Structures are given as C-alpha cells and as structure tokens.
C-alpha cells in the first residue's frame, strides 16, 4: 500500500486517510465453465482506493480502477511485484513466450485472440519485460513497459537505495541474475544492463552452508526502452538465430 501526494479525501469519497494499493492476478483466472485460463488472458492490474480508519487502521474499499494496458500491448503473465523507492508499482512478465513457437503455441495463440481478437496479432517480443505502474492522486494508474531491462522471466525486481541500481532475478530453471543501472534516479527508461558471473570457490560436492563463490558482472549493453521497443516491432526470430 502507498500514499500519494495530492490525494484529496473528500474528492475520493474517503472519510479517513486515503491510501492506495496496486493489485494483480496470476492464478485466479477461469472461464465460465471453470477452466483454467492461466496465460490465455491478458493480465490485469488494478488500483484500489482505500479508506483507512486513522484510529484502528481498518481499510474499506472505495474505488476499483482497471489500468489501461493498451499502450503497452497488454500484459503477459504477471508475477511478483515490488514497490519502487519513488512509489510506483514494479510488476513483471514471467516466462517470456518463445518467439519461434508463437504461431503454434496454444497458450500464446489464445492470449493473442483474447487480447486482439486475432490469434496471430500479438508480437512475442512485446512480452517478458518490466511494467511500471504510476498511481495517480485520483485513484487511477498509468502503465509503461521498460523494454531495456532484459527480456527474461521477471519477478520481484529490487531497486537499491541509490534509486538507479536494480537487481533482477530470472524466475526460470537455470535462469540468470541481472543488474540494471539507470542513467537517472527514479527513471528506468535508459541505462546499462549486466548479468552476473558466479565462480565457485569452495570444494565441489560440499555442504550448501559451506559454499563460497565470487560474483563479477558482465556488461550486456546500453539502451533506452524506446530503442528496444523499436527493435521488438521489427525483428523476427530468424534474424538472430536458426533452430534445427
């Protein structure tokens, strides 16, 4: 939960303290027949306006606002999120879709159809990125998607106190550990991306509690989100690799 500067309790219909929460849904999507729709529907994120009793802390829901995701191509599978030091909701798109299989994968085809009414319209390179939601004082939210933080299985990004450095796990088997260093504080739209190289220093086969390793960082490149988004709009999988 968070407070937002400029939030007016009377205008919001709140009698106590106005507080807000950004909520997202991962495993709670079913169709009318009760069938699991995981990954087959675009993921929503909503802003809750809550009325907090200043004496007891009790919360009451006043408003539910669905954030418009049309300008960020909808959201793929959202997972763990964090609150940025500057008060925004840092979400995730995990299990980035395989671009080579996008036209045959039933899950991605269903996602595309439910998003665009067209099984072939969704671009797999638009997903697997880091969405950020700015919560407004009137209880609404605005979405942007950062394409320059790596196309990985994002989950639970953590921004360091310098408000420029972010550590990111890759929630996937044999995934990596990534670091992003932004050009400016409170702004993830441009910066340098790194991946961790972990070197074991303790004996092979030893107890996990006795393990020791060193970490160095390999520079992957510098980019703005706009530059990577432009590439995502143009490239196809065979531009970078062949699969036999």
Predicted features by range, described:
Residues 1-244:
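Conserved small-residue
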């Amino acid at each position: 939960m968070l407070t937002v500067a400029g939030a007016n309790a009377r205008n919001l219909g709140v009698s106590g303290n106005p507080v807000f929460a950004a909520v997202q849904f991962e495993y709670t999507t079913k169709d009318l027949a009760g069938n699991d729709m995981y990954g087959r529907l675009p993921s929503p994120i909503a802003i809750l306006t809550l009325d907090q009793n200043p004496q007891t802390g009790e919360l009451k829901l006043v408003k539910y606002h669905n954030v418009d995701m049309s300008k960020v191509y909808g959201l793929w599978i959202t997972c763990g999120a964090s609150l940025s030091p500057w008060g925004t909701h840092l979400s995730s798109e995990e299990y980035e879709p395989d671009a080579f299989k996008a036209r045959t994968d039933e899950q991605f085809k269903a996602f595309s159809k439910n998003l665009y009414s067209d099984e072939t319209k969704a671009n797999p390179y638009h997903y697997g990125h880091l969405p950020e939601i700015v919560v407004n004082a009137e209880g609404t939210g605005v979405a942007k998607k950062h394409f320059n933080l790596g196309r990985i299985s994002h989950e639970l990004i953590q921004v360091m106190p310098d408000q420029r450095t972010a550590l990111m796990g890759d929630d996937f088997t044999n995934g990596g550990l990534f670091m992003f260093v932004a050009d400016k504080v409170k702004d993830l739209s441009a910066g340098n991306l790194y991946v961790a190289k972990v070197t074991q220093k303790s004996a092979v086969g030893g107890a996990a509690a006795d393990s020791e390793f060193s970490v160095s960082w390999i520079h992957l490149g510098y980019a703005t989100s706009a530059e990577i988004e432009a590439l995502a709009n143009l490239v196809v999988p065979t531009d970078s690799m062949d699969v036999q």
